[in-house]
């Protein structure tokens, strides 16, 4: 089942579809408790960015903070949160531009999805090096 989700995600025809397949359980929870409530009051783009940011922070970055604080260290820069915001912006942009990769081979689609993730995380890591 997990392998199937990963395979479907990386061969998805759009970046938005990638995230629908990536983690169905997180996707359901985030849609129900984050995206939909925000979407009722604000534009879709704000709901998408907010949902990706919440996922990055609460389901990824925040999990490391208690251990760092217990060790007397500062919490880490929220690299995943910022990377997910970049990914959200890519999802919004590719949807607005109607980017569709149906005609591409599955391996090419997988490479494009990996490139998007790599660029988002590279941008976030670079941002983490600035003295905030």
Identify what each model region corresponds to:
Residues 1-61, 103-132:
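Membrane-interfacial catalytic/cofactor-binding modules of polytopic membrane enzymes
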Residues 63-77:
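Interfacial helix-loop-helix junctions of multi-pass membrane proteins
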Residues 52, 79-87:
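Hydrophobic core segments of alpha-helical transmembrane domains in multi-pass membrane proteins
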Residues 87-101:
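Transmembrane alpha-helical segments of integral membrane proteins
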Residues 41, 77-78:
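A generic membrane alpha-helix/interface feature
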């Amino acid at each position: 089942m997990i392998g199937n989700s990963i395979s479907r995600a990386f061969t998805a025809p759009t970046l938005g579809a990638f995230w629908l397949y990536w983690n169905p359980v997180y996707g359901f929870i985030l849609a129900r408790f984050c995206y939909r409530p925000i979407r009722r009051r604000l534009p879709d783009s704000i709901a998408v960015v907010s949902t990706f940011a919440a996922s990055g922070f609460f389901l990824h970055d925040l999990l490391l903070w208690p251990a760092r604080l217990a060790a007397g260290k500062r919490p880490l820069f929220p690299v995943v949160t910022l990377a997910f915001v970049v990914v959200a912006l890519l999802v919004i942009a590719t949807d607005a531009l109607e980017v569709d990769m149906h005609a591409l081979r599955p391996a090419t689609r997988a490479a494009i999805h990996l490139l998007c993730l790599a660029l988002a995380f590279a941008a976030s890591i670079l941002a983490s090096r600035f003295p905030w």
